[in-house]
UniProtKB/Swiss-Prot annotation:
Its EC number is 3.4.13.9. CDD domains: Prolidase. It is an enzyme of class 3 (hydrolase). Mn(2+) 1 binds at residues 257, 339, 384, 423. Belongs to the peptidase M24B family. Bacterial-type prolidase subfamily. The gene is pepQ. This is Xaa-Pro dipeptidase. PROSITE patterns: PROLINE_PEPTIDASE (PS00491). Splits dipeptides with a prolyl residue in the C-terminal position. Mn(2+) 2 binds at residues 246, 257, 423. Gene3D superfamilies: Creatinase/methionine aminopeptidase superfamily, Creatinase/prolidase N-terminal domain. Its cofactor is Mn(2+). It comes from the Bacteria.
Amino acid sequence: MESLASLYKNHIATLQERTRDALARFKLDALLIHSGELFNVFLDDHPYPFKVNPQFKAWVPVTQVPNCWLLVDGVNKPKLWFYLPVDYWHNVEPLPTSFWTEDVEVIALPKADGIGSLLPAARGNIGYIGPVPERALQLGIEASNINPKGVIDYLHYYRSFKTEYELACMREAQKMAVNGHRAAEEAFRSGMSEFDINIAYLTATGHRDTDVPYSNIVALNEHASVLHYTKLDHQAPEEMRSFLLDAGAEYNGYAADLTRTWSAKSDNDYAQLVKDVNDEQLALIATMKAGVSYVDYHIQFHQRIAKLLRKHQIITDMSEEAMVENDLTGPFMPHGIGHPLGLQVHDVAGFMQDDSGTHLAAPAKYPYLRCTRILQPGMVLTIEPGIYFIESLLAPWREGQFSKHFNWQKIEALKPFGGIRIEDNVVIHENNVENMTRDLKLA
């Protein structure tokens, strides 16, 4: 495999080219990209956990250091002012020397407010990208050049197409997340609580709970019906029935986002339904290719959901086509088939149709779908279908003409298991689709 250093060199060349194009299009001289700042909790002297500006970590794998600045113009070597205070109260990260530092000019910044004297004197034509607009104004950046929409749309659109460096980082994040999922399943099988399963996951991945790319969803039994369940009960339930784990990892700022569901017993209806959702997810991925709308795959999976609802006699006396047409599959899979993945878990530009930011919304029937793009080589997406038993979504169907088609007795029997979700991370290539998750033998 090509070294990360050489992949990074090509990655920087790609970002430089995108920057040149963006600056020319929007008549700017350079971009000043801010890592961000610490923000204190209201009426407290304690800061919230730091989350770096994703446009900053696109350039350098510096994810834990506030008050850093990047100046890029697409021509000269990117210049990084790295915050390096003299501080005996807090940990101070050393000036980086790593695989990437040959391609970036790294300069120590001893004071957070010292950047003003180090920037070019003429700043009227510099664009600022970052979370603190008032800081940009203090530095003399024109208000119209603070997070300019056209520039950000342009950069976001091309972030959809991952460089080989980015894909290498995402494969490493997959390895970490897969280790976590294996440890979590073992913890579940040994009877641990959600809280303790989460600790096992974090230990296996080498993350703190503030470092994972999103809050882990560790859901036992009926908790699996809450799509973004993050409570973490300290007490294990008396009876273990099911376990849904939606948890990722991060490597050099790039995310993995995996979900698996396990049945405590292997010989019940729920276990068979888990197997069938898994099989249908793999079957859908096997059909994927460049040049097809992501929306089409979402719609296709509703047809697969209908097949499973019929097979398991959850919906009866109705054709699969009629189920989809009348949205009887909707309450069972209320979310989208997945989303773009990269520097952010729900990565940007899922609805952008071009580099001008033209927006194509999700279909009215499926408002929670997060991507309407035509799949193209270099894109990374999640494929995460599910079937859930959520009373608030099922309740409206208990009345009316379609109620008789719902096997309410079967649904009541499955509700204590919560739901099922299976999620892999895939890369679209010219002639194939790479399943980064299954390549690591995560069943």
